[in-house]
Amino acid sequence: MLYIAVRTSEEGLPMELWSRRKFFLASLAGSAAASAGKLFGGSRSNGGDAPTLASFAPVAQGKRPLIISSSNGLHALGAGMDILKKGGDTLDAVVAAVTIVEDDPNDDSVGYGGLPNEEGEVELDASVMHGPTHRAGSVASVRRIKNVSRLAKTVMEKTNHVMIVGDGARRFAVAEGFEEMNLLTEHSRKIWLAWKAKSSFNWRPGIDSPEWKEHLSAIFDGNEKQIAYAERVIAHPPTGTIPCMAVDSNGDISATTTTSGLSWKIPGRVGDSPIIGAGCCVDNEVGAAGSTGKGEENIKISGGHTIIEMLRQGKSPTDACLEAMGRVARNYKNDKKKLGTFHIYFYAINKDGAHGAASLWRNGYEASKQASYAVHEGSEARLAACTPFFDAVGGDQ
């Protein structure tokens, strides 16, 4: 029987060999993946044309340990890397990193100070997955509990459930010693009041009133920077989220995603962040994936699971993310006008420590800024550019 050598270990270990039959099956899978890419449309910065085999980059060797997150976790990755360097567990590392942001009252994307629902209540969601033990935990629509990533980890460790939601999750948290607190900061409360004023006749001087600007100025004490920020998030409600994933020097992988969800949402709305296989997905033999942006679009394609399966087929993290993005675009028949009403981003790592991310549009939530994500490979945290599916500005700017 003919054998084909496909990889040699740097440590001089025996080569992994494939039989002729396995090689044929692998080639067949690659052909199927290429056909799927043409069906889904879109590729690396090409404006949405169907991808070709040449558009997929070879998988580069990464570095381990590694920890990545969305860009709003940049300053927190060091805490996770410290745990990885000391030989700590990958799940402890990612939860430690996002907890820093959950605790930060000046960050309105997650945790304390997150932007509230339409009634002014902050509702949080989170999920965790632990690759080595194949376990998961999540919580959704949680009020008055700040560190929901840690709460999701507690669900995983202390129960035989995967998800607990709403008041049940709050009561579980209290029973486990979590502190209840008012999560609405003065900053977030003022933005919510401004949104109410903009969205309801009953909460503002009047739709044509010349006093509107004075009213908004009074809410923010004349702070022009805060007024401009409030006007932007009122017009384009953000989906504040941090996915974070890590691989250690042994190749073990974990991930978490934590969020305050869509600003001004209907109470009880749940996005992709706490959904295992959508906003968070880990396979310890392959890699990890997460997402930010409009969670409903990710749920419809099971984005995290899709990315993991693309990694399993041998695609790089970036190309795996672009494949998932292609499915989002396919649902709208690549109609840029419809797709232009929202943002979505995918992030991934593989077992070797390679990493990548894709954005639907070239820009982040601000049209002038390129979409990016945070990476820490052992020396210091840095930002890396997301690869856009459409090389254009979008997202209801």
Listing of model-derived features with the role each one plays in the protein:
Residues 16-18, 25-28, 32, 46-397:
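Alpha/propeptide regions of enzymes that mature by internal proteolysis
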